[in-house]
């Protein structure tokens, strides 16, 4: 039984590791140094995991490039969540899009 004044937390935690082989690639697992549910091939491609942080998934802190609900679901169902880098910006496409809009505006 918990001591008075101490709340028993039902908060889910995750441990986040940075890939040693792939830039901006992170692996989330439920327990520190427990990769037992992560496929072997994924671990080979990920390289030596480098501890980045331990994070409560209670919603108090936002994840930068991941949806907290998807992370929780993946941890529960498969035991890990893999965060890949965002797609590279296509600056040429953005420029052409802006130029096309400017051309359309001047033709009106």
UniProtKB/Swiss-Prot annotation:
Residues 12-96 form the YcgL domain. InterPro entries: YcgL-like_sf, YcgL_dom. It holds the Pfam family YcgL. Signal peptide: none annotated. SUPFAM superfamilies: YcgL-like. This is Protein YcgL. It comes from Escherichia coli O6:H1 (strain CFT073 / ATCC 700928 / UPEC).
